Amino acid sequence: HAALDLNIATFLALVTSARFGFVAYRKLTKVSARARKKRRRTETLKIGTPKEVFEGEARVAMTPDSALQLQKLGHECYVETGAGAMAGFSDAAYENAGVSVVKTAAALWKEVDIVAKVRPPSDTEAKRMQKGQTLISFFYPAQNEDQMALLAKKGSTVIAMDMVPRISRAQKMDALSSMANIAGYRAVIEAGNNFGRFFTGQVTAAGKMPPAKVLVVGAGVAGLAAIGTSVSLGAVTYAFDVRPEVAEQVESMGAEFVYLDFEEEQQDGAATGGYAAVSSPEFREAQLAKFRELAPEVDIVITTALIPGRDAPKLWLADMIAAMKPGSVVVDLAAERGGNCDLTVMDEKVVSTNGVTVIGYTDFPSRMAAQASTLYSTNIRHMLTDLTPEKDGVIHHDMEDDVIRGATIAHEKEV
């Protein structure tokens, strides 16, 4: 019996010891977890948005709403005073959202880890970039090779929002599509502003008015936005695209797809990032013949055709303008790349000798600065979410990620 009592006592002592050891371990792990969490909180990224210096640019890369979301990720947000004024966001609105308003651009660039902008940096802004600092903006690397090389040499990282690959997973970061959507919508509004009649047909006591006829050339993101807006305003809408796979989508929106009496196997749009491929000379002639047939009938033409790495193709020629009715309008969304219309002058509105207005503005998104800033800042926020997956204040530049690799044009002193 004495031996049994001893064994029981020993067993109880071991159990008690193990229990206290487990409790002590639990307490220790909780303390270390809290310490890690506290340490993680102290490592915050500083994200700043300067005022755009490009003349006439009204957009801003951070809005009060996007700043709130970024702060939930553990980041600190900064803006230069007046950065959002032209888009309708006051300094007070930023301060109410917990954003630090900095008096000068120079002070902001020195303070932050990440600079978020809309336009490519100016020469002065590029010089302000520091080693280890990250720039996120539209950049157009083919047009800014010298700046790209300069920033890479400095050891800065550059993420070009215009280089985000057009794949399903990257749609939330696709700033080009966001801006093209706005441009397509605004093109129709701008056309209506210069067109002297109703879009929708009306029957009144004063007489019957036919609906406007609108032709949209190119059914990419901008083209589809223009088609949707035109249809919703009541116009009879036609659309043309060299990619036959978009016909069903166009027709589902209430527009009529313009088919050519010509057979040519076109490259699938998915293989060209959603853009049109170069057509054969025979296809082009058939295309132009169809446009000449439509020119006397349509009141408004909106052209959106672009080919990657090339000047915009000339699709609406001078003789087609001459065949249009006086008071008609052409809006050329490809004006920045030379234009689809013969008479287009970049950033200007011209009137032909027969009274056709040709609009070549390139700042349609900036003309809707509040909406454009809201969408663009959301694209930026999603990019930052992918760059900081651990929410620990550390940028994880995963070059095995298709989206991050595709958008990064300078990193670790390499282009």
Where are these regions (language model features)?
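Rossmann-fold NAD(P)-binding glycine/threonine-rich loop
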Residues: 142-168, 312-363
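Adenosine-phosphate binding glycine-rich loop
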Residues: 162-164, 168-202, 335, 341-415
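An N-terminal-biased, well-structured beta-alpha scaffold segment characteristic
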Residues: 44-150, 154
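Glycine/serine-rich phosphate-binding loop and adjoining beta1-alpha1 elements at the start
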Residues: 34, 46, 52, 123-213
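A structured beta-alpha segment of the ubiquitous adenosine-cofactor-binding alpha/beta core
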Residues: 99-112, 120-121, 268-318, 361, ...
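Glycine-rich phosphate/diphosphate-binding loop of Rossmann-like nucleotide-binding domains
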Residues: 50-86, 200-294
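Glycine/threonine-rich flexible loop motifs
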Residues: 56-61, 124-129, 137, 274, ...
